[in-house]
Amino acid sequence: MPTIQDERNLMVFSGNANKPLTQSICKELGVRMGKSLVSRFSDGEEQVEIEESVRRQEVFVVQPTCAPSAENLMELLVIIDALKRASVSSVTAVIPYFGYSRQDRRMRSLRVPITAKVAAKMISAIGADRVLTIDLHADQIQGFFDVPVDNVYASPLLLADIWRAYGTDNLIVVSPDVGGVVRARAMAKRLGDTDLAIIDKRRPRANVATVMNIIGEVNGKTCVLVDDLVDTAGTLCAAAVALKQNGATKVVAYITHPVLSGPAVDNINNSELDELVVTDTIPLSDAARECRKIRQLSVAELLAETIRRIAFGESVSSLYVD
């Protein structure tokens, strides 16, 4: 019986940023991971060699550009270049977490770069034929690329876990800030039009602590905070305190990308947050894996099905409408 690899000449390669995720994707697809050397020379420069024939193959390279962002981005670029020079049919950059995505505009016309566009231009210029990513920080970032972008959503995975772990009785979806209202509303709608609350953060004047106003009734309810990424977790933990002070019985958070930099794990351990559920778009640190409040879901099946649909020329948008 022919496999997907036999039928479509499909191959999956990995950088070093998240090999366990790549291995899980390959298992879901029923293909083996492509053979390659991805290392560094003694002076720190990237060293890449594709160790098998890829001529006329449809290749997918899995590499999130998480920390160390510059190294992982450069690694992705040189892998793509090596594959293009080896005469592949096409290369899809599978970037589960697109680093630099928060640097997507010039705030107040400051003299700063739009680094998300710089990274997108580099990936386009090196020869990637398309990009597959999950939950971009802003959908408009797709326009920074000069190649097609499939931005799929982790919400089906997160929603299924919410249904399974918490049900919908006495549940309310909470946006941690005004900017996340669209995402939170979409999640609430998928949970049977459950209630929605918004946290409005305001600093009354300079040197005065930020005040968190809760828009919505959370008293006696299980609050589900939703967002695309968690970094130091300061805002998330402050939101949990505000919700508990307003009578919430339980506060959990469902967030796609676990950046978890700096004091994030300590903040979560010492917070009012009951549980933080994340995905494996970014590998967890040892400290995060040992944290009893953090639970991780896998996007491997989601990405594998998307890769399969791309390889067979099937619709992706019909599967991941959000």
From Swiss-Prot:
<keyword id="KW-0963">Cytoplasm</keyword>
<feature type="binding site">
    <location>
        <position position="203"/>
    </location>
    <ligand>
        <name>D-ribose 5-phosphate</name>
    </ligand>
</feature>
<dbReference type="InterPro" id="IPR029099">
    <property type="entry name" value="Pribosyltran_N"/>
</dbReference>
<feature type="binding site">
    <location>
        <position position="227"/>
    </location>
    <ligand>
        <name>D-ribose 5-phosphate</name>
    </ligand>
</feature>
<protein>
    <recommendedName>
        <fullName>Ribose-phosphate pyrophosphokinase</fullName>
        <ecNumber>2.7.6.1</ecNumber>
    </recommendedName>
</protein>
<keyword id="KW-0460">Magnesium</keyword>
<dbReference type="GO" id="GO:0005524">
    <property type="term" value="F:ATP binding"/>
</dbReference>
<feature type="binding site">
    <location>
        <begin position="102"/>
        <end position="103"/>
    </location>
    <ligand>
        <name>ATP</name>
    </ligand>
</feature>
<keyword id="KW-0418">Kinase</keyword>
<keyword id="KW-0547">Nucleotide-binding</keyword>
<feature type="binding site">
    <location>
        <position position="177"/>
    </location>
    <ligand>
        <name>Mg(2+) 2</name>
    </ligand>
</feature>
<dbReference type="Pfam" id="PF14572">
    <property type="entry name" value="Pribosyl_synth"/>
</dbReference>
<dbReference type="InterPro" id="IPR037515">
    <property type="entry name" value="Rib-P_diPkinase_bac"/>
</dbReference>
<dbReference type="GO" id="GO:0004749">
    <property type="term" value="F:ribose phosphate diphosphokinase activity"/>
</dbReference>
<dbReference type="InterPro" id="IPR000836">
    <property type="entry name" value="PRibTrfase_dom"/>
</dbReference>
<keyword id="KW-0545">Nucleotide biosynthesis</keyword>
<dbReference type="GO" id="GO:0006164">
    <property type="term" value="P:purine nucleotide biosynthetic process"/>
</dbReference>
<keyword id="KW-0808">Transferase</keyword>
<dbReference type="GO" id="GO:0016301">
    <property type="term" value="F:kinase activity"/>
</dbReference>
<dbReference type="Pfam" id="PF13793">
    <property type="entry name" value="Pribosyltran_N"/>
</dbReference>
<keyword id="KW-0067">ATP-binding</keyword>
<dbReference type="InterPro" id="IPR029057">
    <property type="entry name" value="PRTase-like"/>
</dbReference>
<feature type="binding site">
    <location>
        <begin position="231"/>
        <end position="235"/>
    </location>
    <ligand>
        <name>D-ribose 5-phosphate</name>
    </ligand>
</feature>
<dbReference type="GO" id="GO:0006015">
    <property type="term" value="P:5-phosphoribose 1-diphosphate biosynthetic process"/>
</dbReference>
<keyword id="KW-0479">Metal-binding</keyword>
<dbReference type="InterPro" id="IPR000842">
    <property type="entry name" value="PRib_PP_synth_CS"/>
</dbReference>
<comment type="pathway">
    <text>Metabolic intermediate biosynthesis; 5-phospho-alpha-D-ribose 1-diphosphate biosynthesis; 5-phospho-alpha-D-ribose 1-diphosphate from D-ribose 5-phosphate (route I): step 1/1.</text>
</comment>
<feature type="binding site">
    <location>
        <begin position="43"/>
        <end position="45"/>
    </location>
    <ligand>
        <name>ATP</name>
    </ligand>
</feature>
<dbReference type="InterPro" id="IPR005946">
    <property type="entry name" value="Rib-P_diPkinase"/>
</dbReference>
<feature type="binding site">
    <location>
        <position position="137"/>
    </location>
    <ligand>
        <name>Mg(2+) 1</name>
    </ligand>
</feature>
<dbReference type="GO" id="GO:0009156">
    <property type="term" value="P:ribonucleoside monophosphate biosynthetic process"/>
</dbReference>
<dbReference type="GO" id="GO:0000287">
    <property type="term" value="F:magnesium ion binding"/>
</dbReference>
<dbReference type="GO" id="GO:0005737">
    <property type="term" value="C:cytoplasm"/>
</dbReference>
<comment type="subunit">
    <text>Homohexamer.</text>
</comment>
<dbReference type="GO" id="GO:0002189">
    <property type="term" value="C:ribose phosphate diphosphokinase complex"/>
</dbReference>
<feature type="active site">
    <location>
        <position position="201"/>
    </location>
</feature>
<comment type="similarity">
    <text>Belongs to the ribose-phosphate pyrophosphokinase family. Class I subfamily.</text>
</comment>
<comment type="function">
    <text>Involved in the biosynthesis of the central metabolite phospho-alpha-D-ribosyl-1-pyrophosphate (PRPP) via the transfer of pyrophosphoryl group from ATP to 1-hydroxyl of ribose-5-phosphate (Rib-5-P).</text>
</comment>
